[in-house]
Amino acid sequence: VEIEEELEIEDTETDEDEIVEIEEEDDDEIFIVVENMPLFPGCSDEGCTQSNILRHISRNFKYPPMLKDYGIEGRVIATFVVNKKGKASDVQILRGLDKKIDDEVVRVIKSLPVFTPGKQRNKPASVRYTVPIYVQLQ
């Protein structure tokens, strides 16, 4: 097997009159950790925020009635972004159980209250969270 590689190098020199644009930092960057993490309403630290996210999900999750006969239980792993305005967005299921259960997890996460946004370098920043959710039929 022969592989041909062709490398093309473009001229990077500029003329004196040429205007060079410098790209600004990406404003839509999503962080995992920032200097000041988002805060759940009424919280002053990250531990309180984590507890309240899980409490909100637990209290507001409604097991889909049509699945009760099947007794589907287990862990759903979801990820979402607390955006610069403090809203939960970009909810995705990384590991699901059933479409109806996964849809309910997405609904509940989207219903999270507005957070105090996270900050990086004193500017609002979007922060991604990943949460394991244990679904049990009760």
Can you name each region flagged by the protein language model?
Residues 1-138:
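Charge-biased low-complexity segments
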